Swiss-Prot record:
Disulfide bonds: none annotated. It is found in: Plastid, Chloroplast. It comes from Zygnema circumcarinatum. Part of the 30S ribosomal subunit. GO terms for cellular component: chloroplast; ribonucleoprotein complex; ribosome. This is Small ribosomal subunit protein uS11c. The lineage of its organism: Eukaryota, Viridiplantae, Streptophyta, Zygnematophyceae, Zygnematophycidae. The gene is rps11. Its main location: plastid.
Amino acid sequence: MVRPANKILIRKNKRRTSKGVIHVQASFNNTIITITDVRGQVISWSSAGASGFKAAKKSTPFAAQIAAENALRVLIDQGMKQAEVMLSGPGRGRDTALRAIINSGIQLSFVRDVTPMPHNGCRAPKKRRV
């Protein structure tokens, strides 16, 4: 089952920041949430795997929601009030993670989708045959 996040990774010097950036990377296998200040220094991070989900359960929307709540718990303790959200990747947990961020009470200045899209660059991998 899901274990509570008692050990959330925090930098040793607890800097008070009023504004930050929340990066949500949603792949097909996992969802990783990284919270940085405006200069890019990591304040906290969490993922579905670090929140206690294993194997195929890491890719579920519920796992992304729990990972976002675990990462945002540090922000609320540090007093962050405003954040920007950068969504990346095609995973199933991106909308649920965004919903958890909105419900946390942090004021969002904007939400941006920064998923890299090729302009017909490299050849795509072959289709799966099951």
